């Protein structure tokens, strides 16, 4: 299959226009993911709950390469697509990584943390029990606690809260 015809998750960058682009994509019926979360901020001396992007400036668009590029070229969306460092082609996130990322951000926002993408790689693991059952990622230690990291290659990683060792199984490399 030609790369332009294959459907996948592409990653775009924008500057402070996540909500606008999210709304535009929704109106056009384009599958996308722009995660937001609630934070408490002090505004004019008062503490208020506000919604802000979970990952500043990033927008995930599902489609083929051609349709994604058309959003910029034909519709003038204020964003640009990130490129894979090694191939220089548009950065595409594998479906399983994206499914796990969406699940964690949508359902467990208060139990995850965002980390830079350059974490030291550990064993590949799958969570087999508990809240995060089915999630695959890398086993790491942060502050002496076992956590599973879901890595979006070349972007960032998110880590679960502590996971007991009995809830994990090692995934053999293929």
Residue map of PLM features:
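Glycine-centered loop/turn positions within well-structured domains
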Residues: 146
């Amino acid at each position: 299959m030609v790369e332009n015809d294959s459907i996948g998750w592409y990653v775009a960058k924008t500057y402070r226009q996540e909500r606008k682009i999210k709304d535009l994509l929704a109106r056009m019926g384009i599958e996308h993911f722009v995660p937001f979360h609630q934070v408490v901020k002090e505004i004019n001396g008062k503490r208020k709950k506000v919604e802000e992007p979970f990952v500043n400036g990033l927008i995930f668009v599902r489609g083929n390469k051609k349709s994604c590029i058309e959003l910029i070229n034909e519709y003038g969306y204020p964003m640009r697509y990130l490129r894979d460092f090694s191939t220089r082609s548009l950065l595409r996130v594998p479906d399983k990584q994206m499914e796990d990322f969406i699940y964690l951000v949508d359902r467990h926002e208060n139990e995850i943390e965002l980390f830079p993408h350059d974490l030291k790689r550990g064993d590949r693991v799958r969570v087999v029990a508990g809240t995060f059952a089915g999630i695959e990622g890398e086993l790491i230690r942060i502050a002496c606690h076992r956590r599973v990291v879901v890595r979006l290659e070349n972007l960032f990683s998110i880590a679960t809260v502590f996971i007991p060792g009995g809830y994990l199984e090692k995934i053999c490399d293929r």
